[in-house]
């Protein structure tokens, strides 16, 4: 990517190299990013040398984009922040409030305050105070949902950009991170949940979502589809299937997995499985 500055109305442009990757999802030292999907830019209304950039996270510069420091980090690891994947920044000219649009909704702050990684790592929380304005917005896009077979009202649902959520009959809880995908509620154990994130990363909770562990359902380390399928054989309790390039099966309640197919035939390009179903009563 490139960051360019003009001081003559666009007649000439200067390239700035901030020395960090402000589009990445980490601390700026790692490659990658999603600039074709999430990208936002705002210049301070009273000081043109102060610039804010949004990629996965939010970064700020006080020297006209020569150097950048973090302003918000999506995992909440270093204190309250905003959701990942920034799309647009806007300033209200009368109040000075700044509005941030991202995959999690809409946030407002009176001032975007630049922080530093050293302070964050040393336990000093992000100084910017955010108000989440997303409550009541019916905009979440769900990929998969499962309901309990023995407890009315229990649900688990995976949502684009907004993790996997569990409903215990009275309240919703966010239980697994990432983009929420396929999932499962154990009919024999009200506290056992299985959920997944993009490309077939599966997680299990045995305490109703308060803690979780990674589950390796992919013994051959194959690629999975964006919404990698997970199905249970309810006629044979403890038998599960997942689909990557091939179908994997577990006969011991998800502890061990083995491939049961060898797709594709020679000469045919491999593709990820996008749907699985178990025949009832057979």
What is the meaning of each model-derived region?
Residues 1-282:
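Beta-propeller blade termini and top-face loops
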């Amino acid at each position: 990517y490139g960051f360019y500055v003009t001081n003559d109305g666009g007649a000439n442009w200067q390239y700035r190299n901030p020395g960090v990757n402000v589009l990445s999802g980490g601390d700026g030292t790692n490659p990658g990013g999603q600039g074709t999907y999430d990208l936002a830019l705002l210049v301070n209304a009273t000081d043109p040398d102060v610039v804010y950039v949004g990629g996965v996270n939010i970064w700020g510069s006080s020297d006209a984009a020569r150097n950048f420091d973090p302003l918000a980090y999506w995992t909440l690891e270093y204190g309250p922040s905003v959701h990942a994947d920034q799309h647009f920044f806007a300033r209200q000219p009368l109040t000075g409030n700044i509005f941030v649009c991202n995959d999690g909704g809409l946030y407002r702050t009176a001032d975007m305050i630049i922080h530093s990684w050293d302070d964050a790592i040393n336990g000093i929380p992000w100084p910017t105070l955010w108000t989440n304005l997303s409550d009541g917005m019916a905009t979440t896009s769900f990929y998969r949902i499962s309901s309990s077979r023995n407890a009315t009202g229990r649900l688990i649902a995976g949502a684009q950009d907004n993790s996997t959520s569990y409903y215990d009959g009275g309240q919703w809880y966010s239980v697994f991170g990432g983009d929420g995908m396929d999932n499962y509620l154990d009919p024999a154990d009200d506290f056992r949940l299985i959920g997944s994130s993009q490309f077939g990363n599966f997680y299990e909770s045995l305490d109703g979502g308060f803690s979780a562990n990674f589950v390796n359902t992919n013994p051959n380390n194959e690629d999975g589809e964006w919404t990698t399928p997970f199905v249970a054989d309810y006629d044979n309790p403890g038998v599960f299937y997942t689909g990557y390039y091939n179908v994997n099966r577990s006969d011991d309640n998800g502890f061990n997995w083995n491939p049961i197919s060898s797709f594709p035939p020679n000469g045919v390009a491999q593709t990820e499985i996008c749907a699985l179903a178990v025949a009832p009563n057979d």
